[in-house]
């Protein structure tokens, strides 16, 4: 355990009491996140509590991995880890238990997350502002992928935005380094990553030798969500999620995805047959810009080897045609309250309500406006 601590480049852990907790802004399997301020300087920060699943096993390897990755990644569009703090420990603590107790990761504070902003009907994004959001998101992905890091949990709630309109990729709790597989030795990463509604088809089919395309699928889901205001494919199970993907992106077959039949799950699951690709048709009621539709379509490609990467996505005509990307600062300045998914009122948390199976879903035209906004 001491060896694990020594590998983290923070020479000691300050006490978390140097920060005053102001509000809880997040909750999940990872633990809790609090808005706080430095008692002396007044600087606002976010405190992420490290969940000690089994303290006898020492410092959680997932938290250690997150810390190491965040120490490596320094970019305007990646959340900044300031330091690591702990609760007060015994005066008899030694080098082997100097960070015993509750551990907190301390980050620069961001006023909003994208899920919180999209859950608020009063927040209106112009096309130029959506372009800026996606440009910053893809810049962040380009940077982490160049540094051989996969995020593995791309979703709107993990996209933070500061009051000045700067986007930060956040929550690297599932992130990991990756390498190009050698023919004789394919990678064997876990495929139990990425929140279900944003999980790409290759992971749902059991792929363990994957790379950056898994994050780009999530980017495509998030981009569509900028218009639909809620996740576009809200499956209840992995098979249901694959069914929704097939209904939107077309049937999963070897014709559109060579060698997909190599997956054992592909043979076992009864996936929809004869489905045509409908990404543009289904989204055009929301997305009026043809370049935007084109980019979403190229990100939501079934075959990961044909999916657009972040570099090509940033060169898409969407970002280089009028209206050009514009800052979010002015729009955000009209909203004084922080907006996070965790704090969204229940009636606005449509993203948390699983979509009905296709054979039970009602005609959108027959739903009231609030229901129509919730389910794509």
From Swiss-Prot:
ATP binds at residues 25-33, 48. One of its GO terms (cellular component) is P-TEFb complex. One of its GO terms (biological process) is positive regulation of protein localization to chromatin. The active site is at residue 153. Residues 345-376 are annotated as: Disordered. Belongs to the protein kinase superfamily. CMGC Ser/Thr protein kinase family. CDC2/CDKX subfamily. This is Cyclin-dependent kinase 9-A. It comes from Xenopus laevis (African clawed frog). The gene is cdk9-a.
């Amino acid at each position: 355990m001491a060896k694990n601590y020594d590998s983290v480049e923070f020479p000691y852990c300050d006490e978390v009491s140097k920060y005053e907790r102001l509000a809880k802004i997040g909750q999940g399997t990872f633990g809790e996140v609090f808005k706080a301020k430095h008692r002396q300087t007044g600087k606002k920060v976010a405190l992420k509590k490290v969940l000690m699943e089994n303290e006898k096993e020492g410092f959680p390897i997932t938290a250690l991995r997150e810390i190491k990755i965040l120490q490596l990644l320094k970019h305007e569009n990646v959340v900044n880890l300031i330091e690591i703090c702990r609760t007060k420990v015994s005066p008899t603590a030694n080098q082997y238990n100097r960070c015993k107790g509750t551990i907190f990761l301390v980050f620069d504070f961001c006023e909003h997350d994208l899920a919180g902003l999209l859950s608020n009907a009063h927040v209106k994004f112009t096309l130029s502002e959506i372009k800026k959001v996606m440009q910053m998101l893809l810049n962040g992905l380009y940077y982490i992928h160049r540094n051989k890091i996969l995020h593995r949990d791309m979703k709107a709630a993990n996209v933070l935005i500061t009051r000045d309109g700067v986007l930060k990729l956040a929550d690297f709790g599932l992130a990991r380094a990756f390498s190009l597989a050698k023919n004789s030795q394919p990678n064997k990463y876990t495929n139990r990553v990425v929140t279900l509604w944003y999980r790409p088809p290759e992971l749902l089919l059991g792929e363990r030798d994957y790379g950056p395309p898994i994050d780009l699928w999530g980017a495509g889901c998030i981009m569509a969500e900028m218009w639909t205001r809620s996740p576009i494919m809200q499956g209840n199970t992995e098979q249901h999620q694959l069914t929704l993907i097939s209904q939107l992106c077309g049937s999963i077959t070897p014709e559109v995805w060579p060698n997909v039949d190599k997956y054992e799950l592909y043979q076992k699951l009864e996936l929809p047959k004869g489905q045509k690709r409908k990404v543009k048709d289904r989204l055009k009621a929301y997305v009026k810009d043809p370049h935007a539709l084109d980019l979403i379509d190229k990100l939501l490609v079934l075959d990961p080897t044909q999916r657009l990467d972040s570099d090509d996505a940033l060169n898409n005509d969407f970002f280089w045609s009028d209206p050009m990307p514009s800052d979010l600062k002015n729009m955000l300045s009209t909203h004084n309250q922080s907006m996070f998914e965790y704090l969204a009122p229940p009636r606005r948390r449509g993203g948390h309500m699983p979509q009905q199976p296709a054979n039970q879903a009602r005609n959108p035209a027959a739903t009231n406006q609030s229901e129509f906004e919730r389910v794509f």
